[in-house]
Amino acid sequence: MHTLNKYQKALQNHPFNLSDNQVTENVNQIILENFAENNHMNTYKLLYSCLDLTSLKTTDTREHIWKMTQKINDLEGSNPEIDNIAAICVYPNFVKTVNEALTANVNIACVAGGFPSAQTFLEVKIAETAIAVTQGADEVDIPINVGLFLNEEYEEMCDELTEIKFACHEARMKVILETG
């Protein structure tokens, strides 16, 4: 008899069986039912304050990241009714650039952990994460290893995430699915 582990039990207890069309229909229904009550400036302000300004292009340079950061610096205080964006998100090698250029009260986020596919050595993921945090990252976005997940190697996947989280120290770690 096959015994389910805690991950299999959790997935079994929370099945997701909607098609893409059903998800789209449900989202459209939620928007239709709630649009009027949320179509006001306070909602827009909240949404703006949740945004991460992100640059994850293969052509990114220190100069480009510096200029992008400067635009956020220039916006700070320009409209006292609107809070800053949540963060500037970059590749880990640009965290130091953002940290040096940033004067606005905005967090620094980065992708790490073998982004986008998580297909590298655990030691590389840990080192990349630790260096990014040391250079000023407040948040680190880590992709799950989809191969481990699909192969139902949940324990190994979670162990990896736990070790990477340890490398984050006080920085927030956000686990992401890279689907694009």
What are these regions (language model features)?
Residues 92-114, 152-179:
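Alpha-helix-loop-beta-strand connector modules within alpha/beta enzyme cores
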Residues 75-84, 171-174:
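Short, surface-exposed connector motifs at secondary-structure boundaries
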Residues 41, 58-66, 92, 126, ...:
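Electropositive phosphate-/nucleotide-binding environments in soluble metabolic enzymes
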Residues 34, 50-62, 109-126, 147-153, ...:
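Active-site mouth loops of central-metabolism enzymes
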Residues 61-72, 122-132:
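Short, acidic/polar
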Residues 79-135, 139:
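Active-site cofactor/substrate anionic-group-binding motifs, chiefly glycine-
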Residues 1-51:
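Charged, compositionally biased N-terminal leader segments and the immediate start
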